[in-house]
Every structure is written in C-alpha cells, then in structure tokens.
C-alpha cells in the first residue's frame, strides 16, 4: 500500500524566494538598516530575560499594546501573528466556506492566490490598468455580480509600488458586503492608512508588519487589526502560542521606541527617492520604458530587457526580483548599493544601444 496524495497537494506551487548568496541583495524589500549598537544591547538584555521554559503569552498583550500605542489603535482590536502570512492563512481558513469566491487583483502579492489553493476556494483576478491602478468601479461591480465573499489586496502594492488613495478604499469597503482584507505592509512609507477607522467597519481587516519600515524581518511578526467581533474570531481561530516570546519581546521594544522609526524613516525614504530618480533618468534617456510612482521602499520598472538585466546583475553579485518578461522590482538599499545597481544597468543598456548603432 502507498499513500495517495490528493490533487490539492500535488498542484501546490510554493512561494519562490530567491536562493543563493549575493553580495548585494535588493530582492526582498528588506530594510538596509540594522538597529544601533545601543538598540542591539537593549535587545540582548531582553533576550537574557526570556523564560525559555515557558510558553509565550498566547495573546501577546504587551506586543499588541506597543503596536496600539504607536499607531493610535485600541490594543483590544489587534491580533499578533507569526508574520502576516500566518494571519492571511487564518483569515482564509476561518472566514470562507467551501465554494466561497475570493477576489484578487494582478499584479499583487502572489501568496494571496496560494492560500486560495490551500482552502480550495475559487479565485477571480482582475487585471490592473497600464498605470498599475485598481479599477475601483470594476472591483465593486465584480464583488456584487459574482457574489465575492472576500477581497484581498496590498496597499501600497507589492510588487508595483503604486498606492490606492484612502477615499477609493473606503468606497470598496462601504459599497460591498464582502470581507475586505487590506494588506498595509508598506503603509509606513505612505500616508493613506485606514487604521484609525478600522473599528467603524464590520467587513474590514487590516494587516501590518514589522518586516519593512521597522526592519525586523527576521522576527516574523505581523498584525491583523479589525473591529471587536472580527478580532474575537481571529484570536479564537489562531494557534494558541503563535508568536514566540523572543519575537514578542523584541518587537515590543522596537514598537515602544518612536525614535526608532523617526530616525530610520527619513533614511529609508531618501534611499527610495535616490533609486527612483536614478531610474527616472534612465527612462528619460530611453534606456527603460517606465518607472512607476512609488509609495514603498522599492521601485517597479518596465523594460523589455528585464531577464537580461537580472542575469547581468547576478553575474556581478547583485540580486533583484523579476516579474515576467517585462518588469523588475528593486529594493532601495544603501546609497552605495543604489548607485552600483544603477551604474551597472546603465552600463549594460548603453553598451547595447551603442552596439545597435555601430
């Protein structure tokens, strides 16, 4: 006898992070900044005090309180998770019946569709326009006409870096009866959050993370914020001890220090501006087709040389992310990293241009 895998398991397509060791990593939208020496010393002291023989606080009270204080939301409306991915999985498995339809947009974070394959829910996908904008009227009409139960999207968007303004998001929430899962992983880089309004809606869950602006990707710490009813359901549905004690303590330390973000945010935004302006210059020179507006810590570039550029950079120890044959996503790094990636790409494309006209 042998175990026969079900079709769902056979057809799973896992998330495909870039593997290998590279000198410059601009592929995962991580922060290029590390905590200061004093911050690291404080973190070390906290780790020394962790009771490793005890299970963590199941509701991460101190962590949720720190998040609530920083962002001005009631901690009772916050659910902590082992990264936002865990919370997406909990949301899908909890709020969807078998057969319920999920709506996504494209391009967007690929894991949304992955989780629909796990829960075996039909998934509709609407394409964004040439400017990588969501057609709000189309979204609302599709939810109504197709009986969509859950609509999930990132704002600002990963991978396009384009954001949808607050009023447009409000329309989707107010004019439909679907559960709206609003992934604000990159909202620390923009100013259109709906966190301050979340308690007013019975069909909204907002996701946030410590991995981007806060630079704590290694901790795997995310949050779901919703009204009291939805939060009670999320807390009941998640695993009992889902966020380990080290993550709870260290993330709470960072969230409790407003100076941490106040110091790092201008540096990250300056890096993003430098990188975007560099690609805008390449666009003006006719070397890339388009660089999209950015509300995140990365830039999204359209070029028919995407595959060649990625390989050219790899050969020089630099890794970026490619989407299909025509798009690149480049994380903002240090000034030196930004300058190097811009110089290498410009060198390659100018050389090709010269060769064509030789």
Language model features: what each stretch is:
Residues 1-54, 147:
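N-terminal "arm"/small-domain region of PLP-dependent enzymes with the aminotransferase-like
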Residues 5, 94-153:
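PLP-dependent aminotransferase-like
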Residues 36, 203-281, 291:
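PLP-dependent aminotransferase class I/II
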Residues 41, 45-83, 271-274:
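Conserved N-terminal alpha-helix of the aminotransferase class I/II PLP-enzyme fold
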Residues 60-61, 75-99, 222:
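Conserved beta-loop-alpha segment that forms the PLP phosphate-binding cup at the N-terminus of a helix
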Residues 130-188:
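Active-site phosphate-binding strand-loop segment of PLP-dependent enzymes
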Residues 167, 307, 312-316, 321-358:
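PLP-dependent enzyme catalytic core of the Aspartate aminotransferase-like
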Residues 269, 282-316, 332:
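Conserved PLP-binding catalytic core of the aspartate aminotransferase-like
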């Amino acid at each position: 006898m042998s175990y026969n895998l079900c079709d769902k398991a056979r057809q799973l397509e896992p998330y495909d992070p870039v593997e290998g060791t590279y000198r410059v990593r601009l592929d995962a939208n991580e922060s290029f900044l590390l905590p200061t020496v004093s911050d690291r010393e404080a973190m070390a002291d906290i780790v020394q005090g962790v009771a490793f023989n005890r299970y963590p606080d199941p509701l991460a009270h101190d962590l949720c309180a720190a998040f609530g204080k920083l962002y001005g939301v009631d901690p009772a409306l916050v659910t902590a998770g082992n990264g936002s991915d865990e919370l997406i999985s909990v949301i899908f498995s909890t709020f969807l019946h078998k057969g319920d339809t999920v709506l996504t947009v494209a391009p967007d974070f690929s894991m949304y569709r992955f989780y629909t394959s796990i829960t075996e829910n039909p998934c509709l996908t609407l394409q964004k326009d040439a400017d990588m904008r969501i057609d709000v009227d189309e979204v609302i009409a599709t939810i109504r006409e197709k009986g969509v139960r859950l609509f999930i999207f990132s704002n600002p968007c990963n991978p396009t870096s384009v954001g949808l303004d607050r009023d447009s998001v409000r329309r989707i929430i107010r004019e439909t009866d679907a559960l709206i899962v609003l992934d604000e992983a990159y909202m620390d880089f923009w100013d259109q959050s709906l966190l301050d309004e979340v308690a007013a809606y019975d069909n909204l869950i907002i996701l946030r993370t410590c991995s981007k602006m806060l630079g704590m990707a290694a901790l795997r710490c995310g949050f779901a914020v919703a009204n009291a009813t939805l939060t009670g359901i999320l807390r009941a549905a998640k695993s009992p001890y889902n966020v380990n004690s080290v993550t709870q303590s260290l993330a709470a330390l960072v969230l409790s220090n407003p100076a941490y973000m106040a110091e790092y945010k201008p540096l990250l935004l300056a890096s993003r501006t430098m990188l975007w302006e560099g690609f805008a210059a390449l666009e003006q020179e006719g070397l890339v087709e388009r660089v999209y507006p950015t509300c995140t810590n990365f830039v999204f570039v359209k070029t028919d040389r995407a595959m060649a550029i990625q390989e050219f950079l790899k050969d020089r120890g630099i890794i970026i992310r490619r989407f299909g044959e025509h798009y690149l996503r480049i994380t903002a790094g240090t000034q030196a990293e930004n300058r190097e990636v811009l110089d290498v790409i410009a060198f390659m494309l100018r050389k090709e241009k010269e060769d064509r006209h030789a």
